[in-house]
Amino acid sequence: MILSKGILVHTHNQSVLLIKGGGLFMSTVQSYFKDFLSNIRLSDNQVKELKTGHTTLRRRLEEDETLSKIIISTFLQGSYRRSTAVKPKNGNKSDVDVIVVTKLDSEEYTPEEALDLFVPFLEKHYKDKYRIQGRSIGISLSYVDLDIVPTSAPSESETEVLQDETIISEYTIEDFQQKFLTKSFNNDLLESAYNIFYKSDNEPQWKAEPLLIPDREAEKWDKTHPLEQIRWTVEKNKNCNTHYINVVKALKWWRKTQYPDMKHPKSYPLEHFIGDCCPNDIKSVAEGVVLTLENIVSQYTNKPFLADRGVPEHDVFARITDEEYSDFYDTVCDAAKIAREAFDCEELYDSVCKWRELFGNEFPPAPKPSKSNSSTGFTTRTEKSAAIPEGRFA
């Protein structure tokens, strides 16, 4: 039965009205995006390995006879904590960042001296597996990469926040998201975490100062604000109807797979840029991808200054040259055109083919339409969508 505003089809033993929105049948396209997102996210085994790696590291730090005396707390940051990580490719491993909040006075210890305090601990537990980097200590295990990021002593008020169980917990933004959608909590700690990370910008607790981390190469202590990065992402995801973190994952995958040899922007700078360009109130991941790419094309012909979350004087794009940005911008122009064509396609099969052109083979293929349904543009799916917990949808 053909209706004036859509097409009534029978699929999965139920009638579904597929309304053309933006030129395509969004309810069906979303099932393809759901499987795509399931394909590119960290696997359960990779998440388990990350947890094994960071919990072992944090326990060893807390139990170390020397370091335990100067450590206030440890907590997770990075794309894993923000739920914007995608699965690694080409033999790379999953990674997680561990912030180590210390009592060290930045006036008494140079960055190099602060990092060197960890060497005996590293020699004991991670001999031949660690490297001292510019602003952190990298640990490469057979199954996961870890980054230790030490900080200098925070203020007294900040110390209390950084020792809060919800901050030092391992809950990710997707964990918070589930509770935001269902308003249900299975323990007091998760409810407390939800309440803290869903606070608004003007809450006093988020007037906290940035932390100082050692920059060995610049020979100075530098500001960072990982908690504000987490809070900002939680808020943005809520404002985007929980689609934001999936827009980030989709575009990270595009960057990783379609332009693997392009040096910049790397993971977090790209994520930050997506955050600045993705509109609020998007109705789907597909819409978020299209509008984000088009906003970059229309608003950022030249390399912008990207003010870091919580440290606005820092430029997230500082390490990117104008030439590198120009190369990246050209790739975005191409991607924006493909994404818009995919979004506006009249036929589902053609739309899916365009999305696969953008995202590669992890975006599931659509069977070619038969003569019986080619006139409607509807392609019946032959495979069931992968199960993704509520909230992880396109």
Regions found by a protein language model. Give the residues of each.
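Short, compositionally biased low-complexity segments
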Residues: 25-37, 87-93, 212-227, 303-310
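Glycine-rich, often proline-containing surface loops adjacent to acidic residues and nearby aromatics
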Residues: 92-102, 224-234, 269-271
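Long, charge-rich alpha-helical interaction segments
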Residues: 193-245
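Conserved catalytic core of two-metal-ion nucleotidyltransferases
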Residues: 48, 58-64, 112-200
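Extracellular structured ligand-interaction cores
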Residues: 97, 134-136, 143-145, 248, ...
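Conserved nucleotidyltransferase catalytic core and NTase-mimicking acidic/glycine-rich helix/loop elements
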Residues: 233-344
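Terminal (often C-terminal) interaction modules
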Residues: 2-35, 301-394
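N-terminal regions immediately upstream of nucleotidyltransferase
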Residues: 1-96, 101-117, 136-138, 367-373, ...
